[in-house]
């Protein structure tokens, strides 16, 4: 079984001639300014700009468009008294705004320290689309654990009880950090039996990087184990959970 590593902005969209497409869109927007309020137009604009030059244009041009998306969404929800509504991925009409929100979150994740706005955007994404097709719950949980928000991390993992190994190991860490040692130990032993490579990688001082597909990893495989170690080992070590896990998982 394989799962996506993370959301890849623009992965589902592409154009053969981004220069020409951008010019066409700008002409259309000049003739019909109200289209600036269309999430479908905005996602096409962002994807086209990204194809022109993914690195240099991302912050000066793409970021302002993504900021506009957040403001526009709030206006739409407020105007329709729909602040508590869901915009689930299963409905194609919802996908442009969800893609745009996920893209904005992806930019946030590159910062070493999570801002309050970053947490708000990820939490909003999960409220809008609880099934979380974009996998926002994983980086949100990681940020919770890094920021010692263990109750939030535990609550999040419990919302997805049969989730991928990453979230299940995160539940163990949250339980341990909150002092629920017996529960943490029971979960850890279950995971050590079912997904042993992740725990093995976590406990080792150093491991070789396996071949990793940038789109998918094998659930419980060497690639997922390496990625989990990369993202979480420092937090496990800081909380004193590595030594505990080494003793309890035997």
Please report, for each region that a protein language model flagged, where it lies by residue.
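Long, ordered, amphipathic alpha-helical scaffolds
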Residues: 1-4, 173-250
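"A position-specific structural signal for the A-helix of alpha-solenoid helical repeats
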Residues: 2-14, 24, 41-44, 48, ...
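Hydrophobic/aromatic side-chain positions at a characteristic register within alpha-helices
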Residues: 13, 17, 30-33, 50, ...
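Residue register within tetratricopeptide repeats
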Residues: 19, 23-26, 36, 60, ...
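A structural/positional concept
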Residues: 26-57, 61
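Solenoid-like repeat scaffolds
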Residues: 27-34, 123-130, 156-165, 189-198, ...
